[in-house]
Each structure stands twice: as structure tokens, then as C-alpha cells.
Amino acid sequence: MPDPRFFQTLSPLTVAALAEHIGGEVVRGGEVIVSAVAPLSSADRGAIAFLGDRKFAAALAETKAGCVIVPPSAVDAAPADAAVIVSSEAQAAWARASALLHRPVRLDRAITAAQAAEDDTVVVEPGVVLGEGVRIGRGSRIGANTVIGPGVQIGRDCLISSGVTVGFALLGDRVKLLAGARIGEAGFGAAGSKTGPVDIPQLGRVILQDGVTVGANSCIDRGAYDDTVIGENTKIDNLVMIGHNCVIGRNNLMAAHTGISGSVTSGDNCIFGGRAGVGDHITIGEGARVAAGGGVLADIPPGEIWSGYPAKPLRQFLRETVWLSKQASQKKGAKESKE
């Protein structure tokens, strides 16, 4: 169930009513009532889940979901005790269901600094807007014209600079957010459909653990359902993008213009050079390094240094670069001798 501090759960619907709204066909269990969406792996009897890819067939067989949305080819694989909706656009149908069952808590009214602060050591500069349920730990400072969305929890001795927005997030102690940082915006998720891409509601959170620094104008998206987590003492430079569902380890360093796609996991003590890019669902091992400009399309084992595009182990990259340079020089020399 999405965190109620950040998401409102709307009225439950029967499977039949839901199918009518999302463009699916009920196979069985139209009278079943569902009140939430969830992934196959964590869904309970009150939730609706979907199968978007055959590689998750095992999760479908084991799910506890009260209802599942499946493509026509997977109807027979659905659990016998679950209601079933069939759709050729299962993920898009699930996205539509999510919008019918959950809604982000909006900043309809603000509270005062005194209501949010743990004590009088908290400093809130002019122009700050604080949503309902915000809590700010002692010794923290919120910069001018920053907006803190409903339910956000900020730890002690934090420094949030001017023009920052924070929503759907939990911040530990000693967190620093520099000017213009964007924490907790919706992740980039869209499901294909015959009528065009459908936005997938992002129902997770951002968790910034103790000692995290986020540079100016950097963005960290909230999770699609699970959380985006930045580990203790990780330092993020200006203009860095971290996608939804990422789990970044402790003591990571990310130089400017690094881009981390969704669902990336990094171990502790990893380093990313400037303009490094990491593809989605990649695992970066503990202590690994990505050189500046590297484009990572495969998992990196612990302790290795990778470079280039597509990124590969540094020594291999250097050998190949030298070989290519020699080949180019030989061809150039042969061409000049003919002339």
C-alpha cells in the first residue's frame, strides 16, 4: 500500500467496474473488490497486479493478488483463486487502474514553521511553503522560496538551500540539498497503448539517508512503487539525474551530469565520473568506478574500473583504443605513400 502520508487511497471498486474503466475484459471474479495496486511480488488479497512480461511468469504463479491483469496468452497461468482481467495492454490497464485507486496528496494548504519545527533552533527563511504533516528536525535550515510537500520528514541539522522542492520524501540527519534540487518528482514511466503512451502513476518515495549531499539542480525521482534510496554519506554533484527505484549505496560519489536510469543498484564506495551514464536495471558492484563519459550497459563486478561506450574494463578499453589508433595510423600511412 502506498505511504498514506503522500498518497490518498480512493474508494474501492469491483473488478467488473474496474475492467470497464480500464478497457479490459473480466474472465472471472467480477464481484471481487480491490482497493489498491501493487506488484505481483508484494500484492495482497485487496490489490490488483499485472503481468507485463513472460519473465515474471513465476511471480504470477505465486502472487497473492486478489486480481491480476494478464495478456490473452497468459490467462491459463493466472492463479486459480484470483480474479482475472484480460487485456492486450496489461501494463497500460494497470496504470489506468492505479489512477482510479490512488491519488497524490496535494499541497492544498500550508502550515507554519512553528507547526513543523521540532524546536526553535529550526530556521525557515522567507517564502518557504510547508505542506501539512511536514516535520523538521532541530538545527535544520530551509532556504528561501523552497517548497516542502505534504508529509515530508526532514531530520536534524539538515541544510536545504533556496529554490528547492521536496516531495514524497524522507530525509535523514545532516542532509544537504543545494539550490534548485528536485527531490521526489514522478519517475519517467509510460506504458504503451493503442492510443499512445499512458503515464504510470509513481507511488513510491525517495529516502535520503544520513549525510547525503545533493548538488544544485540535480533531480532524484521517487519510486514507481518501491522506494528510491540514496545511501549514507553519498555525495552527488550538480546536474545529476537519478531515476526511479534506484538503490544507491553508501559513500558513493557522482560527478556532474551523471545519469542513472531507473532500477539501478550500486554498492558502497562507488565512483561515477562526469557525464557517466548507466542503463536501467544495472548492478554496479561495491567499490566499482565508472570513468568520465562512460556508458554502462552491463553489470560491473565489485572493484573494477570501466570506461568507454559501451563501457568495458579499463585495461580492455585502453588496449582496444591503442589497437584502433595503430590501425588508423597504418591505413593513413599506406594511403599517403600511394599518393
Residue ranges of model-derived segments:
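Structural signal for interior beta-strand "rungs" in well-ordered beta-sheet cores
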Residues: F50, I111-P313
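Terminal amphipathic alpha-helical/low-complexity segments used for targeting or macromolecular assembly
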Residues: M1-Q115, R174, G180-A181, A186-V198, ...
